[in-house]
Amino acid sequence: MIRFTDVQNSAKVRTYIQGADETLGALGFTDHGLGHVTKVATEARDILLTMGYSEREAEIAQIAGFLHDIGNIINRVAHAQSGALLAFHLLEELGADPGDIATIITAIGNHDEKTAAPVNPTCAAVILADKGDVRMSRVRNLDLATFDIHDRVNYAVKQSSLTISEDKTVIDLNLTIDTEQCAVMDYFEIFLTRMSLCSKAATKLDLKFALTINGQQLL
């Protein structure tokens, strides 16, 4: 039975994740490296545990979260699908059970908003964890004069948290934004599709998605 640590400590896996991040860096994208995928893995695991799923189901989501962006090593376009295929081969090499592989690659192949669908709880957890990782430290470009809208939005987020209510009915993405760096409407301009996807993912887990910015609930 494959464990998260087997994947996390795999030299091949780490090489491909780092290579994928370098590719995106060259294209001007925000950080998609080990910091991002580790955060997504942890959040996906925590979401399922909080919602009463088993430790094993949560660990499978953790693995999927760690591998979800690996396809960027091939190309940004269709990286969810190429990543699922790459993860399939890596997981087979690591001796993973076919059932676990099936769940993981389904989650990876359906996580990107252009072709996404929260088809199972693992995928839903990965989507929420991935789209919820908005933070200043993901911005590579430190020249404010050359920021694009994605840089501005991420750089403006001073604090972020993804939490599930005590009664397990709402998952809330709570952001503190510096409005001198980015207007709230700028956030909506690039994240509207993502927020719609988060709402669908939350529904898959019997949750309602909420977005709170600077103390005001907007969704």
What is each PLM-predicted segment?
Residues R14, L34, T38, L192:
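Electropositive phosphate-/nucleotide-binding environments in soluble metabolic enzymes
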Residues I2, G28-M51:
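N-terminal low-complexity, intrinsically disordered segments
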Residues D21-T30, Q181:
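Short hinge/gating elements
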Residues H32, N75-A78, D186, I190:
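Short alpha-helix boundary/capping segments
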Residues F4-E22:
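Short alpha-helical hairpin
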Residues D133-L219:
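Terminal helices and disordered tails flanking the catalytic cores of nucleotide-processing hydrolases
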Residues D21, A41-R45, F88:
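Amphipathic, well-packed alpha-helical segments that form the structural scaffold of globular domains
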